[in-house]
Amino acid sequence: SLIEILGWNSEERFYAFSNGIYANGRFYPTDDLGVVTVGRKSYYLPAFSAIHKDNEHGYSFERTYRCDPQGATTLRDFFAQIVKVYGTGGMVCIAWALAAIFRDIIFGRFKYFPMLNLFGRKGSGKTELARAISSMFFVLPSTPCSCANTSIPVIGYNLSHARNSIFILDEFTNDLMPQRIDIFKGLWGGTARSKMEDGIPITIPVTSGV
């Protein structure tokens, strides 16, 4: 079956990346066609499939959301370095990131999930801290998704295509266009945006911590 939403799959009880599935305490990588078999079931993850090898611009979000099972850094050492560099602020980020892994449970109970607002002087390391925390899930591009320049449909897509994960919206300012400010109003309550599709109102959910 096709895996359209990455991250936590509550029905199948596994965590999906674009290059494989983590289940039963181990990582199952995709084959050359993007197929991965877990137990008796097979799943299709198209981002790195040979079928799409010539599609350089497609699956741009999914291709950053991949797992490196050979990583040598332990979670303990990773968190220790964040706290060493960022102190108490780093501790808050770690706590929030761990909560994001269980976002569906928290949101299901309280009907909201807190946003993490990293603020400070220019050059103080806000974006790098966000990138560090997000590296638990992503191999990030050099430039994170911009509040001002990334199109609203793309922001909505990215916010709803990984469950129980983290998503960075970079460079928030108070002079953003009203349509973009409206996105932030909905994030707390779990809605990225609404649209009409074939005359039917569709709500795009937020499935990750922001």
Stretches with model-predicted labels:
Residues 59, 71, 75, 95, ...:
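Residue-level signal for well-ordered alpha-helical segments
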